Amino acid sequence: MIAMEGGSGNISTKMALEDTILTPRFYTTDFAAMDRLNVDLVRREWDAVMAELRADHNRKHFVRTPEFDKDLNELPEALRAEFKDFLVSSLTAEFSGCVLYAEIKKRITNPDIRELFQFMSRDEARHAGFINEILKDHGIGVDLGFLTKTKKYTYFKPKFIFYATYLSEKIGYARYITIYRQMERHPERQFHPIFKWFERWCNDEFRHGEAFALLMRADPKLLSGYNKLWIKFFLLAVFATMHVRDHMRPAFYEALGMPPDEYDMRVFRITSEISRQVFPVMLDIDNPRFWEGLKRLREISEAIAEAKAQGGIMGTLKRAVLPLKAALTFGRLYMLPAKNNELPREIRLQPAW
């Protein structure tokens, strides 16, 4: 076992501290507005979700076994670097949720909402801690206390928190379950034991998403009028960010036996099917122009990275122009026709994928 790199200066912590359009962010919100939330319109289903969260089905699941003693240095260099990036990014996303949910719970008195965020912060802390223990075993743990104090926070109105975190939880479920099912079909590709934990792990993400779906369905105005435009924006932003990010890990997806486009289509399809429970609009992920636009965003992202490495006057000029091209491409993607969706009477779903 490698001695852990010291303090806030270790490489994993620096990776987690990065603030780019592609990295997980930390959020804060209007706590007084959160305190005024009312779930009476969805009370029956709300109580059922809360009963599941209260039961804490995964309280004994996140325990490492001797399998986790495997040295990451045994992996090929490119795969090791990309797997580490995957773990740090996942940890940052989980811990971001933990910090936000814990702060909401601390700052409000509404018993329904307070209990929800207590349970969700519990789960996210457990997930982040599990990943960090794996990193620590290999001397690359993230300093979570330093991260909490130093990471920049982005303010979002509650409705934007709902749109973004609902998608984050549900797409997290889709990502984990897709990898888990691939490992079921191809156990020879399981290069790390963490994947065996993904099935029950992703059920936590699914339950969290169910709670956010109910919060939105409890306030119908969040899902109507100009808010449909915001929903479309968040859908596109989350899908596009995921696509660009996944193509930055070719060795990781080659090891899984799933090309990034194939993986992304599966995740997008699951997420779209699930989001029918709450979103009145859906992206047309079967439109060839959608994938052409994602490819263009990916190429621009790669060009920005090359310009940064190039440096000098030309590199600086490119870094000024290329984000404008990315914004224009995103705008064109946003203008593609969306699909309308009639919301179902029964909101809750089961993780059946």
Swiss-Prot record:
Q: Which UniProt keywords apply?
A: Bacteriochlorophyll biosynthesis, Chlorophyll biosynthesis, Iron, Metal-binding, NADP, Oxidoreductase, Photosynthesis
Q: In which pathway does it act?
A: Porphyrin-containing compound metabolism; bacteriochlorophyll biosynthesis (light-independent)
Catalytic activity, reaction form: Mg-protoporphyrin IX 13-monomethyl ester + 3 NADPH + 3 O2 + 2 H(+) = 3,8-divinyl protochlorophyllide a + 3 NADP(+) + 5 H2O
Example GO biological process:
photosynthesis
| An example molecular function term from Gene Ontology annotations | magnesium-protoporphyrin IX monomethyl ester (oxidative) cyclase activity
Q: Which domain of life is it from?
A: Bacteria
Q: What does this protein's UniProt record list under function?
A: Catalyzes the formation of the isocyclic ring in chlorophyll biosynthesis. Mediates the cyclase reaction, which results in the formation of divinylprotochlorophyllide (Pchlide) characteristic of all chlorophylls from magnesium-protoporphyrin IX 13-monomethyl ester (MgPMME).
By what name is this protein known? Aerobic magnesium-protoporphyrin IX monomethyl ester [oxidative] cyclase
The organism is Bradyrhizobium sp. (strain ORS 278)
